[in-house]
Amino acid sequence: MLRPMVRPGAILAAVALCALTRAQDAAPATAPGTSPSATDPALLRLREDSDRAAERGLQWLAAQQMDCGGWAALVGHKMMDDYVVLDQALSVEEQRARGHAHLRVSAIAGMAFLAGGHLPDRGTHRESVRKVVDYVVACSRDNGFLTDSGTRMYSHAFATLFLAEVYGMAGGEAVQAALEKSVNLIVDCQNTQGGWRYNPFDREADLSVTVCQLQALRAARNIGIKVPEDTIDRAVAYVQRSRTRSGRNQGLFYYKIQGRGAYEKNREFAINAAGVTALNSAGIHDRELSDPALEFLLRAYAEVADYYATHYYFWYGNYYACQALFQDGGPRFARYHERLSRDILAGQQADGRWRNDCGPGDAFGTAMACILLQQPRQYLPIFQR
């Protein structure tokens, strides 16, 4: 087992939040050291517009939050360009009537509040954060599986990531207990390929689900939760094997490398963004392979933004692309995030939400939009170098 490690960035973020919010109950407008340059009025206005838009989005999310602490949304999975609702999952109407919610959407919404500097005991949205933390903890089963309304391993991973970020920023015994159990389940569910799939203990793996689990494990380990080193190493090896090593698509990632559909797709925006992000978080920065993948993301962004602006592809893909390009830094990220921010601002609805027409629904789109717009604040550990 690895010695517990506490990520310095997570501690600094928590300390900065506490110091700032003792003097002011509202969440801080910007994190220390992240203010846009005063010499660039256009970028300064963009940042201010982004902060205002994100706050309107958070207000919409707060108004939509249910008494259980979560958000209702369609439980399903991507199939080609469509989103298929699972037969065994609770419908949105059933969730609302029975006090259940969509776990992954709720965890992402919780992360949106954290990204704005709100904690369970700090910030204007502290009550929403408290409620969603309690909701996610309540979704923990005896075996450690985090699930609600029929959600699967995607939701488990995002819920684990959310708990890790909350625990790193605010602590809490109940959060720690649920987090440790959820991490143990991920470890136990890792298959012989080194990855994960939709359901616990699936024999096959795919890169999308695997990256979610790996990022959750890394986040947990960084704030002191014990994770076997071998589990991380095997997952990283799976991601590495998913990468094209030569030829026209050098550096790009395959969605699957075994079973049906293996080696069929390696030019998908979200998959390549997720692959680079996973390796970056593991400290692997191979310029020869990463540069082609990052350049692919910049080229592919225009198509995703133009044709999939309200689609699951846009929100999920940019969640990872923003992390991958931010870790790379420099002019590539600046160019990307300026375009991304302007596109997101243009899509905000009059009531403050963002649409997600193909996917879980508008709570998902709004939460993702708020996370991406608030990235410059760097409160979330996933957006700290």
Describe every region a protein language model picked out:
Residues 14-23:
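Hydrophobic h-region of N-terminal signal peptides that target proteins for export
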Residues 2, 24-25:
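N-terminal acidic, proline/glycine-rich, low-complexity intrinsically disordered segments
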Residues 334-351:
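Short glycine/proline-rich, acidic loop/turn segments that cap or connect secondary-structure elements
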Residues 1-12:
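Bacterial N-terminal signal peptides that target proteins for export
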Residues 25-59, 63, 67-128, 141-184, ...:
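An alpha-helical repeat/solenoid feature that recognizes helix-turn-helix modules
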Residues 18, 350-353, 382:
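Intrinsically disordered or highly flexible coil/loop and linker segments, enriched in small
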Residues 126, 133-135:
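Active-site-surrounding "flap" and adjacent substrate/cofactor-binding loops of secreted or lumenal enzymes
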